[in-house]
Each structure stands twice: as C-alpha cells, then as structure tokens.
Amino acid sequence: MDKKELFDALDDFSQQLLVTLADVEAIKKNLKSLVEENTALRLENSKLRERLGEVEADAPVKAKHVRESVRRIYRDGFHVCNDFYGQRREQDEECMFCDELLYRE
C-alpha cells in the first residue's frame, strides 16, 4: 500500500468517524429529550396516584351515605327503583326491583 492509498484510507476513516460522531450526538440529544419527558411523566403519574388515593379514601364514605339515604327513602314508603322511582309504595308492600337495588353488592 503506497502513501496515497494509506492517506485516502485514513481520510475515509476520519470522515466515517465524523459521521458516526454526528449520529452519536443526535442520539444523545434524543435521549436527553426522552429522559426529560420520562421525568415529567413520572412526576405527573405520582401526583395522579396521590390524587386517586385521596378520591378513593373519600369514595366509600360518600357511597355509604348515598346508600343510607336511598334506604331511608325506601323505609319512608317510596320506590327507589328505576321503574317506579318516587312513587309511594301502597301499604308499604315490598318491591323486588327496589330490593334488588338496595341489596346489590
């Protein structure tokens, strides 16, 4: 291999290294962007989980209160089922639709 071929090979290798370096820099920039997005999403996820915990803690209390209100309306002699809601139950007779609603899990 003469000096010119050696110089050309070294020059080609140098050019390939520059292209590879540019690719690595682009990958680093993309990775930095992804890490920042990931950090933001983790923070948002953490806040949402915290908020969900607060909402779930309040939910059983509200559900119990609503269920008690519906039972009280039924005991007062009114239908709570979808078919006859708000109508007075004649002689406080049982309604299977209301019972299903009141005692479902």
Curated annotation (Swiss-Prot):
Keyword Cytoplasm in record: yes
Keywords: Cytoplasm, DNA replication, DNA replication inhibitor, Metal-binding, Zinc
A Pfam family it matches: YabA
Protein location: Cytoplasm, Nucleoid
Disruption-associated phenotype: Increased DNA replication initiation rate. Reduced growth rate.
GO cellular component terms, A-Z: nucleoid
Named cofactor requirement(s): Zn(2+)
Cofactor mode of binding and number, as noted: Binds 1 zinc ion per subunit.
Annotated function: Involved in control of chromosome replication initiation. Inhibits the cooperative binding of DnaA to the oriC region, thus negatively regulating initiation of chromosome replication. Inhibits the ability of DnaA-ATP to form a helix on DNA; does not disassemble preformed DnaA-DNA helices. Decreases the residence time of DnaA on the chromosome at its binding sites (oriC, replication forks and promoter-binding sites). Tethers DnaA to the replication machinery via the DNA polymerase beta sliding clamp subunit (dnaN).
Protein name as annotated: Replication initiation control protein YabA
